[in-house]
C-alpha cells in the first residue's frame, strides 16, 4: 500500500530529533493521564523496515507489582510514574541485548527491573514493544490506513486476526483499546476498564498533541528559571489539559501563516539544542539503541502476507486459514494523496467512524472485505525471548543457544544433588533417633554424644555378658547330665530304674503312671547360686529364673515384672530340693520397649531381697 509521503517524512523527523522524542514522551504521558488509562504507545514507520509500523515510544500508567528505586532521593508521584516507564524501556533493551547479541548481558544497576518484578499489565506493555504492523493490519494498521480512530471494547474477546494481542490482553485484563492517527503515526491507548466509545475522550487524549509544546519567552525571569530547572531535571509536570485553549492556539498559528510557523520551529530547535549536555545524553542513548538493532538479524517482512498470525514452531504456532491477497492499493493511495493536499499544515479535527467493535461486527466486516493480513513480529528473537520469560523458560538467566541449555542442565543436576543430599541427611537423622531410643540414658542429643554413649553402652553389655557366662559355667556343667533314681513297684518287687535326664529339657514320665504329661524342667544347682536369663524377640520376652526358694519370692518376681510393664502370657515353675526354677513368657504392654539388661537387673534385685 502506498503511504502518504508527508506522514512518513513527519515520522522520520520525529525519530531523528532527540528533543522531539523527549517532548513525545511528555505528550504520551499527558494523553494517558488525561483520561486515566493504563498505557500509551506510539507507532511510527520504521527506518529498517520501510512501510511497517513499529513501536517508537510509550508511557505506562497502570498497576505496579514491584517498585524499585535506584537512589535514596524522594520522588514525586509524577516522577515515579515516569521512572516506571523508563525502567520498563530499560528492561526491554536489556532483554534485546541479552538474546540478540548472544553475549552476556552487561551489569545493570541495582534499581533495574527483572522479569519477575513485572505484573500482567506490565508484561503486556513490554511484549507489545516487539510487534510490528503493516497498514491495514491490526488496530494500529487499520487506524493508520483509514486515517481515523479505531475503538475496541472487550479486547479480550476479540479474534486473533483483527487483534493479534488478544491472548495477552486477556491475561492482562485489558478491556478497551483506542488507536488514533497523530503526527505521522498512531497513538494507542489501553485500559483495564470497559469504556464505551465517546468523542470527548478522543479529543482529550489528543489535546496534548495539538497544543503547542515549544517554550515561549516568559515575561518574568522566574518563569524562565523554572523552565530551565525542569529541563535540567528531566521530569515533566502534568498539568490540567484544556482542549479549547489548545484549539485556539492552533487557529492562531494557522492564521499567522507558513512563514510564522517556520520561524517558530527554528526558534524551538535552537532552544532545544542550547542544552548540550541533555542533547548529548539523549543522542548517545538513541545511538546505542539503534546500534543494538543494527547488530541483530533484522529481516524484512515478507510481502505476500497470509491471513492469520504465523509464528514458527517454537513460539506457540497458531494455524492459519487460507491465504488471501491484500486489497488493491490504488484507491487508498489516491485518497491519501488527496487528503494530504487538502489538509492544513497543523492537523485539526478529524472525521470519526463510530462503529461498534464486537465479535459479530468483526466477522461481518471480514466477510465483506478481505481479512487484514496477519501481523508478523518485527524482531523474532526478542519476542521469542519474551515469550520464554513469560512461560518461565529461564531465558533471562541464559544468553541463548547451547550456553543456555548447558546452564539449564547444570542447574537441574545441582537441584537433584541437593535433593538427594537432603534425603540422605533425613535418613541419617532417623537412624540416630532410633539409636538414641535404645540407650538407657543419654546426657546430650547431638550425633557425637549418641555415638560415644552407644560405644560405651556396648562395652558395658559385653562386660556383663562375660560375667554372666563365667558365673554360669560351674552350675551348668554338673547339670548337663544328671543321674536320678526313680523307684516304682513292679510285680511285687522293687525295681530300681536308672534314668539320665538332661537339665533344662522337657520329658514325658510314664514311669509315674501318667502318660503324655509335660513336666517343668529339672534343675540341679548348687546352693547359694542364682541365674537370670532374659531373651527378647520383638515384643515377646522369655524370662528364666533359677535361685534358692524363699517365701514371697514369687510375689517379688511378679511385682518386678509388673513394674516393667510386661503382660504375662504363661508361667512354668518348679521347686525341687529347695531350688526354684521359673520360666515366664511375657509381652510388652505398650509401644515402648525395655532394654533387656534393665529387666535382668530388676529380677536380680527381686530375688536378692531378704
UniProtKB/Swiss-Prot annotation:
Pfam name, any one: bHLH-MYC_N
The bHLH domain, residue ranges: 412-461
Keywords from the UniProt entry: Activator, DNA-binding, Nucleus, Transcription, Transcription regulation
PROSITE patterns registered for this protein in UniProt: BHLH (PS50888)
Feature: compositional bias, Basic and acidic residues: 508-519
Gene Ontology terms: biological process: regulation of biosynthetic process; regulation of primary metabolic process
Major subcellular location class: nucleus
GO cellular component: nucleus
Location of the protein in the cell: Nucleus
GO MF assignments: DNA binding; protein dimerization activity
Record region (Disordered): 402-422, 468-524
Gene3D superfamilies (alphabetical): Helix-loop-helix DNA-binding domain
Stretches with biased composition (Polar residues): 481-495
Biological function: Putative transcriptional activator. Controls tissue-specific synthesis of anthocyanin pigments in various parts of the maize plant.
Protein family (similarity comment): Belongs to the bHLH protein family.
PANTHER family on file: TRANSCRIPTION FACTOR EGL1, TRANSCRIPTION FACTOR TT8
Subunit architecture: Efficient DNA binding requires dimerization with another bHLH protein.
Protein's recorded name: Anthocyanin regulatory Lc protein
Organism this protein belongs to: Zea mays
Amino acid at each position: 500500500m502506498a503511504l502518504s509521503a508527508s506522514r512518513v517524512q513527519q515520522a522520520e523527523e520525529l525519530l531523528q530529533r532527540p528533543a522531539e522524542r523527549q517532548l513525545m514522551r511528555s505528550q504520551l504521558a499527558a494523553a494517558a493521564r488525561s483520561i486515566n488509562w493504563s498505557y500509551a504507545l506510539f507507532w511510527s514507520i520504521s527506518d529498517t523496515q520501510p512501510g511497517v509500523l513499529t513501536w517508537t515510544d510509550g508511557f505506562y500508567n497502570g498497576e505496579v507489582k514491584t517498585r524499585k528505586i535506584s537512589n535514596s532521593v524522594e520522588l514525586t508521584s509524577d516522577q515515579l510514574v515516569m521512572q516506571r516507564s523508563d525502567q520498563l524501556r530499560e528492561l526491554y533493551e536489556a532483554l534485546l541485548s541479552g538474546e540478540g547479541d548472544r553475549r552476556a548481558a552487561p551489569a545493570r544497576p541495582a534499581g533495574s527491573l527483572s522479569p519477575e518484578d513485572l505484573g500482567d499489565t506490565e508484561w503486556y506493555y513490554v511484549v507489545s514493544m516487539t510487534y510490528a504492523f503493516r497498514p491495514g493490519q491490526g488496530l494500529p494498521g487499520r487506524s493508520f490506513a483509514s486515517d481515523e480512530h479505531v475503538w475496541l471494547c472487550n479486547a479480550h474477546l476479540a479474534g486473533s486476526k483483527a487483534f493479534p494481542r488478544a491472548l495477552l490482553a486477556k491475561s492482562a485484563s485489558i478491556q478497551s483499546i483506542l488507536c488514533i492517527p497523530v503526527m505521522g503515526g498512531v497513538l494507542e491507548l489501553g485500559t483495564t476498564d470497559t469504556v464505551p466509545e465517546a468523542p470527548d475522550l478522543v479529543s482529550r487524549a489528543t489535546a496534548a498533541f495539538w497544543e503547542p509544546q515549544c517554550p515561549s519567552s516568559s515575561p518574568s525571569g522566574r518563569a524562565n528559571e523554572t523552565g530551565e530547572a525542569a529541563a535540567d531535571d528531566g521530569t515533566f509536570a502534568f498539568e490540567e489539559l484544556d482542549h479549547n485553549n489548545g484549539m485556539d492556539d492552533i487557529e492562531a498559528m494557522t492564521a499567522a501563516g507558513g512563514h510564522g510557523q517556520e520561524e517558530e520551529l527554528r526558534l524551538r530547535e535552537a532552544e532545544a539544542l542550547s542544552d548540550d549536555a541533555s542533547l548529548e545524553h539523549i543522542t548517545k542513548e538513541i545511538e546505542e539503541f539503534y546500534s543494538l538493532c543494527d547488530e541483530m538479524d533484522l529481516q524484512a517482512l515478507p510481502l505476500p502476507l497470509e491471513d492469520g498470525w504465523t509464528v514458527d514452531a517454537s513460539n506457540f504456532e497458531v494455524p492459519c486459514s487460507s491465504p488471501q491477497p491484500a486489497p488493491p492499493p490504488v484507491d487508498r493511495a489516491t485518497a491519501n494523496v488527496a487528503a494530504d493536499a487538502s489538509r492544513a499544515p497543523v492537523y485539526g479535527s478529524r472525521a470519526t467512524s463510530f462503529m461498534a467493535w464486537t465479535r459479530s461486527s468483526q466477522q461481518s466486516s471480514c466477510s465483506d472485505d478481505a481479512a487484514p493480513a496477519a501481523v508478523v513480529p518485527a524482531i523474532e528473537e526478542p519476542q521469542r525471548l519474551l515469550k520464554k520469560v513469560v512461560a518461565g523458560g529461564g531465558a533471562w538467566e541464559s544468553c541463548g543457544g547451547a550456553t543456555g541449555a548447558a546452564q539449564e542442565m547444570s542447574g537441574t543436576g545441582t537441584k537433584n544433588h541437593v535433593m538427594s543430599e537432603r534425603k540422605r541427611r533425613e535418613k541419617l537423622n532417623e537412624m540416630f533417633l532410633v539409636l538414641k531410643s535404645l540407650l538407657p540414658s543419654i546426657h546430650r542429643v547431638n550425633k557425637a554424644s549418641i555415638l560415644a554413649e552407644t560405644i560405651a553402652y556396648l562395652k558395658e553389655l559385653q562386660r556383663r555378658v562375660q560375667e554372666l557366662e563365667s558365673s554360669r559355667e560351674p552350675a551348668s556343667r554338673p547339670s548337663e547330665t544328671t543321674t536320678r533314681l526313680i523307684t516304682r513297684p513292679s510285680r511285687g518287687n522293687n525295681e530300681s530304674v536308672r534314668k539320665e535326664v538332661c537339665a533344662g529339657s522337657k520329658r514325658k514320665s510314664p514311669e509315674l503312671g501318667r502318660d503324655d504329661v509335660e513336666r517343668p524342667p529339672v534343675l540341679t544347682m548348687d546352693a547359694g547360686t542364682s541365674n537370670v536369663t532374659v531373651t527378647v524377640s520383638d515384643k515377646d520376652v522369655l524370662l528364666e529364673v533359677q535361685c534358692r526358694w524363699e517365701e514371697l519370692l514369687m510375689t517379688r518376681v511378679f511385682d518386678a515384672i509388673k513394674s516393667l510393664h510386661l503382660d504375662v502370657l504363661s508361667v512354668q515353675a518348679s521347686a525341687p530340693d529347695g531350688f526354684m526354677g521359673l520360666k515366664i513368657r511375657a509381652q510388652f504392654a505398650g509401644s515402648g520397649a525395655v532394654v533387656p539388661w534393665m529387666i535382668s537387673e530388676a529380677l536380680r534385685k527381686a530375688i536378692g531381697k531378704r
